[in-house]
Every structure is written in structure tokens, then in C-alpha cells.
Amino acid sequence: MSEKIIVSGVGCCLVDLLYNGIDFQSETLHPFLSKERGDGGLTPGQLVFQEEFEQYCGLPFTDLLDKITGGRVYDKINIGGPSIVSLINAAQLTENNHCEVRFYGRGGNDEIGQYLLTSLGKTPVVLKDYQLTDNRTPSTVVLSDPTYDNGHGERMFLNSIGAAWDCTPDQLDDDFFDSNIVVFGGTALVPHIHDNLTELLKKAKSRGCFTIVNTVFDFRNEKANPSKKWPIGENDDSYQLIDLLITDQEEAFRLSGRKDATEAIRFFIDQKVSSLIVTNAPNR
């Protein structure tokens, strides 16, 4: 390996379309709220796929969004996704410290895809293998209620996987696995990477990489098996291959199948995760 520290990441990279000031307790929003786990309705703090939300409500997504937002345009458009955002932060913090941060992924060749590509080009992250495909760019509509939970605030997420379906393990080249640190971020929204995570982690460890996994709400598995714990890769062998696991409390509950924070942490320890961060905003 070179003297420079190389960090390579793959995972969720998308466009966030933020709508502020959405009242989660309003009569307008009430018909769209979830009634049971995985049903496709909205839940504060959680993510649902736009297609599932359409099925749940029985209306096209654009019509639903107009009803929820009053037909207004989004307040802000941003680079989003737990993989690329954390990598950008790391690159900004280490830019002058002999560290190079790289990203692998796929976007769509559409208007917001061009926005995303241009915006990423303004960051210190090196786009090692980021290409635009004929699929639509991954995006998340973010509904924000700053008054929710006694003023602590909360968000709800409506995601479209889009071109993230085109991101596959074979696109991760030797340079990826020759990195000092590899980061798999929010891969539940990049299905082919997520479903092969055990083998990818195994390959990374065999090449001497320090492995980091940071999670995101896994609606795909929540929908498929709402009563079962979420898989991370092919099987639980993934955990012993992770040097640092970063998850929030709700995701920790779903991944472990436990309903208590201490029990969830015990599960990860028993699975031989080397180190672990579980966030619990705003009560952390």
C-alpha cells in the first residue's frame, strides 16, 4: 500500500429533496401513516420506498406528494445518502493529511443525476468508479417536522432506489480492496452490494482492510419479513468481519431482532463485531 491512507467506499449516494415544516400530526398526513410494520405507510424516523407508498395509498406518487406538501416545490436539494455524505465529511476533515477518499457507485443520466455528478465534483472525494446509467437517479424525498417529539424534530423518508440497482460487486476493482479502509454505507439501498456483503467483507479482510459498515433503514427486508431480524449480507458471518459497525438504535433493534438496547448490543458483541456505535438522537 502507498504511504497515503486510502479510504474507499461504496453504498448509498442519492439526491435528497427536502420539504420543511410538514406537520406529522396533521389531518392531512393522517391517512398516509403506517398502521403496521412494513405496510408501506409513513412512520416518523423511518424510510419507505416510493413504489410501496403508492401501493399503500392507491395513488400515483406525484399526487400523494402534492397532497402532503400542498403542491409546493421542495425547499432544498442536497447530496444525500449515508455512504457519500460520511465520505465527504471524512475527505473534508483529512484533505491535507495524506489521505485520499474514493467512492464507487452508480447514478442516473437524468437532470438530478447531472446535478449530483456536478455537486460531487466540487467535493474532495475522488470518484473512482461513478457512472451514470439509463436508470433514474436514486433519490429520497425527506419530510421534516421540526416541532415533532416536543421540539426535538424528526424526518420521514420516501426513497427510490433507481440506478442503485445497477451497482454490483464486480464493479469493485482491486484498488478498492487494496485500500487501507473500506466503507460499506447504507447498502440496504444498494441491493446487489447489500445482498453480497458477507463475501465482500471477507475479501476486504483477506486483503488486510479495516472494514466499516454504517447502516440505513432496510425497508426491503422490513417489507419482505416484518417479524424477522434484518439480514446483513448472506448471513450473520458478516458481523465478525466488521471492524466498526455504526447504526442507530431502531436499526440496531431490527438487525439484532431485539427490543432492548442492551440486548441488541449484546447480540452484536456475541456476533464478534470488533467495535460498535449505536446512536439514539435526540436521547443519545
Which role does the model predict for each range below?
Residues 2-102, 111, 115:
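Glycine-rich phosphate/adenosyl-contacting loop at the front of the ribokinase-like
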Residues 9, 103-105, 143, 213, ...:
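Structural beta-sheet core signal
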Residues 91, 95, 121, 202-206, ...:
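Anion (oxyanion) recognition and catalysis
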Residues 101, 127, 211-213:
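Hydrophobic beta-strand scaffold residues
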Residues 110-123, 142-148:
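Active-site-proximal loop->helix
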Residues 119-135:
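A glycine-rich helix N-cap at a beta->alpha junction
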